[in-house]
Every structure is written in C-alpha cells, then in structure tokens.
C-alpha cells in the first residue's frame, strides 16, 4: 500500500526545511548543566572526529573490554585467505570494502564519490523485478561488488553523473540537490538482466543502534497511519520482514528501507555482501553460478567471521553512544524547536521515545532518547524512488532516518551530504 505524506514533503519541501532546523538545533556549545532532554548515561559530550565512536558511559569493565575488541574488528582491514593472521583472513573473493570502517568512516555517515572517483562509502543494490517478486540478478546477485582479490574478476564499475538542481524558497533562500544518473561499466559477466533495477545507498551512521533496537514494537507501530485516517496529511507504515534465523516475520528497524529486523542480521548480511565474509549465517561465498573462478577460489572456511567476532561486533554497535544535544537552552535553539514542531516536522521526525527492556543490555533499557524519527516508511515521491521494493517497502518508500548527530557530520565525516544516495547537500 502506498503512502502519501512524504510525497507532499518532497513537493512542498518541508523535508528540507526540517533538516535546516535540525542543523540549527544541533550547532552551538554544549550546556551540560541544562541538559535534561535525554538520559546522560547513554550519551556523550564530544565535538571532535570521535564524536560518534564513544561507548555509552555506563558500560561495566567486562563489556568495555568487549567493546574495545569490537571496535578493533570494526576498523581492522581483512586480507585474502590464507593469511598470516587467520582471524582476519577470508576477504572476498569479490567485495566492496575490506573493513567495516571503510564505509562507516568514524562510525558516521558515508557520501557519494566526487566526479570521476571510485566508490568509498557507497554501495549499489541490485534487484530483478519479475512477476511481483524481487529476485537477485542472475549474474551479479543482490549487490554489485566493484573489487576482487588477486586473480578474480570484479563484477563491475559504477559511473555517476550529477545534474545540479536548485530549489528557491519563497524567501529566496536556495538549496541545492545533485540529481544522480548511474551507469554500470566494465561488467565482467555479461549484462544485467533486463528487469534488474539498481539502488544507490550511502553508508548510514552506526551509533545509537542499540537504543533503536530497544524501542518496543508497540511504540513504533502506534505511529503508523498508512491511510491517513487522522486526516493530518501525513501517512506512514511499518515494514515487516522475514528474520532469516527464526524464520518469523518481525518489525523492520534498520537500513534505508527498514529491511532488517535486528542488528545481528544487519551485521552478518553486510559482512557477506560488502566484504565477502562467510559465517554460520552465510556459509557460502558471495559468488553467482556464472562466476566459476570466484566460487572455486581459496577461502577462509565457512565461518570466516566467527561467532565470537560476531558477538563482539554486535556489542560494539549496540553500545555506541549518541552525541549529547548541544546548546539546548539557547534562545534561537528553543525557537527553532518550536518551529520544527509547528510546521509539522515532528509528524515524521518524532523527537522522543523511551526504550523498553533490551534483551542483552540493561544499560540501554528504559532510557529517554531523542532520535527524531518514527522509523516508519514514507512515500518520498518518484524523484527519490529507486523502484526496488524491500519486503513491504515499495520502490518510492524510505524509512525516516534518525536526525541525532546531524550537526556533527561535517566535523566527523568532513561533508554534509544527506539522503539515501547523498544527493542533498
């Protein structure tokens, strides 16, 4: 079922007005004495390039050691098997990056490449749309891998052209969008299927994910209004996805289309598709049948990413703290917050949740948080559509991204690119 609210946002660019307000709200000096809007024990006061990389302050010593081990794995470059250090071999055969931090730089937000440059923190999903089903491309699978280990062919290369678009507000303020056009070159295994669509995705920030995991299903679902029954002009729906471990249908929370129901699935799926790392969840290599040399290449075994490593990565990503709100008592900030609410931004970017009980971390349980998201899907219109459905998300629907930490992107990641493909700036 299609939603309508975000299409209205795109045509009447409330979406970009809301982002402008959030950028204003997130600038300025910290005022910790006045800080009361989000629990201090799950947030950190940092305005450096490490602002997204700190653990929540209330971790005990044992979990802090595991967090440090997880951070080491997150930043460590994997190598081709067999390697001198077996615990980090198994890269590829085809892949996009050789480390988690290669895409999620400083645990922050990725960006599209500059003209003529290779992808660094962006990937391209593939989906063959046939008879109302979403299938892998027969030659290239569900993601295009633009790199490969020695002796193996990469799958293809991406060329991006940008066409700058200006939008002028009624007050004459100008915002810029770069409309991207994608072309896949140097395909190694023949053309894409005629029904295959491509979807560009920049890497999202990874802090605060454990807190999102701790929000109860009921608290997310209660904001859904797919048919706009309350007549406020805003509609949104939640995504229901298949959990590959339990085989049950669960609420989607993570990813640009809310296509992952848990951080575990997000981690092992990304390790397999982005880096070519097998695990007990994905024991096979990420090679399609036509890629014979890829399938026959030497591997690091069926669990190149071990269960112990997965647990450390999971704890690391669950316990990354969110940046503390800044300048909360400033007059302009307060006025910006009032405007943010009055023009309807909070209809989708809901400011406040209280987490439920987290299954593994009491430190994340029953905390007041300020993510500025409803975690629902909204129709963002044909200009932002990728035509790639994901579970119950349609091609023109995207999950509302959390806006916490927005004002620190320029400090941490040295850019201000926004949206799923980084076209807004």
Question: Where do the model's predicted regions map?
Answer:
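Periplasmic c-type cytochrome electron-transfer domains
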Residues: 25-425
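Bacterial N-terminal signal peptides
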Residues: 16-24
């Amino acid at each position: 079922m299609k939603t309508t609210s975000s299409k209205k946002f795109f045509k009447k660019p409330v979406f970009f007005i809301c982002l402008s307000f959030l950028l204003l709200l997130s600038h300025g000096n910290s005022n910790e004495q006045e800080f009361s809007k989000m629990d201090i024990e799950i947030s950190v006061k940092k305005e450096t390039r490490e602002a997204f990389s700190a653990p929540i302050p209330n971790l005990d010593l044992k979990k802090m050691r595991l967090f440090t081990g997880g951070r080491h794995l997150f930043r460590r470059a994997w190598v081709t098997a067999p390697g001198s250090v077996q615990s980090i071999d198994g890269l590829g055969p085809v892949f996009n990056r050789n480390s988690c931090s290669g895409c999620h730089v400083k645990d922050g937000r990725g960006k599209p490449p500059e003209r003529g440059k290779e992808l660094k923190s962006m990937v391209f999903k593939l989906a063959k749309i046939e008879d109302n089903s979403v299938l892998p491309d027969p030659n290239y699978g569900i993601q295009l891998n633009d790199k490969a280990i020695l002796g193996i062919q990469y799958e293809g290369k991406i060329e991006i052209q940008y066409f700058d678009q200006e939008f002028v507000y009624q007050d004459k303020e100008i915002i810029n969008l770069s409309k991207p056009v994608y072309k896949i070159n140097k395909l190694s295994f023949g053309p894409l299927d005629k029904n295959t669509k491509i979807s560009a995705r920049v890497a999202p920030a990874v802090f605060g994910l454990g807190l999102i995991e701790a929000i109860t299903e009921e608290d997310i679902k209660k904001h859904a209004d797919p048919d706009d029954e309350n007549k406020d002009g805003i509609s949104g729906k939640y995504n229901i996805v298949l959990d590959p471990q339990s085989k049950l249908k669960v609420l989607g929370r993570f990813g640009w289309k809310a296509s992952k129901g848990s951080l575990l699935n997000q981690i092992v799926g990304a390790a397999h598709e982005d880096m070519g790392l097998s695990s007990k969840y994905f024991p096979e290599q990420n090679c399609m049948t036509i890629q014979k040399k890829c399938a026959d290449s030497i591997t690091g075994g069926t669990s190149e990413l071990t269960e112990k490593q997965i647990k450390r990565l999971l704890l690391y990503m669950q316990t990354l703290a969110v940046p503390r709100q800044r300048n909360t008592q400033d007059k302009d900030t307060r006025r910006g917050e009032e405007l943010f609410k009055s023009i309807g931004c909070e209809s989708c970017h809901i400011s406040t949740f209280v987490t439920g009980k987290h299954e593994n971390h009491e430190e994340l349980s029953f905390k007041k948080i300020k993510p500025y998201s409803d975690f629902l899907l909204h129709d963002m219109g044909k200009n932002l559509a990728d035509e790639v459905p994901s579970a119950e998300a349609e091609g023109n629907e995207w999950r509302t991204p959390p806006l916490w930490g927005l004002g620190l992107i320029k400090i941490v990641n040295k850019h201000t690119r926004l949206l799923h493909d980084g076209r807004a700036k």
